[in-house]
Amino acid sequence: MGKVTFNMTMSLDGFVAGPNDNPDNGLGDGGQGLFNWYFNGDTEVFISEGTPPLKVSKQSAELMKESFSTLGAGIWGRKTFDIAHAWGGHPPGSPAFIVTHNIPQEWVKEGSPFTFVTDGVESAIHQAKKVAGDKDVVICTPSILQQAIKAGLVDEIYVDLAPILIGGGVSMFDHLGIGPVELECIQVTQTPDVIHLAYRVIKK
């Protein structure tokens, strides 16, 4: 059975986007610098069909390729789905499960890469794990992560720590609503533009 993981880029002060993030301002005010590491390297990595490759460091490329090789399904929230404009129908993790209260009917069709889940995060994780089989399910939205941690369903957390202070916006770990969650550091990879951190969630 694969693992349930979380992976996002975060600023040094804990934000994954600046204030006022929306479909016309995807990373929010001041958030663009989070992803400089996507373009400052010399190794190409393709993350989804129909999009140009990223150019990252060799170390980052190796980690990303390893991550994609074990990816069985992805989970996002509806806000992320809308901000990304549905990734043009090519999400960077397919099949893609979208947790939402309102299903966008234009994407309910044969061949759609999206499964819309209206009965909560735990249901989305259960469905994604069933599809992923022996591969991993990756969560890519902070609010989904927070709910999944509360439910004790997250096995590992991967943070790409960007060298920037945003000062406000979308916090990765807001609203946990529980006591301390102990983590075990399992990997640290330092590059000139980003530090990749990996933690195992210690479950009690």
Predicted regions located by residue number:
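Enzymes that bind and transform nitrogen-containing heteroaromatic metabolites
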Residues: 1-204
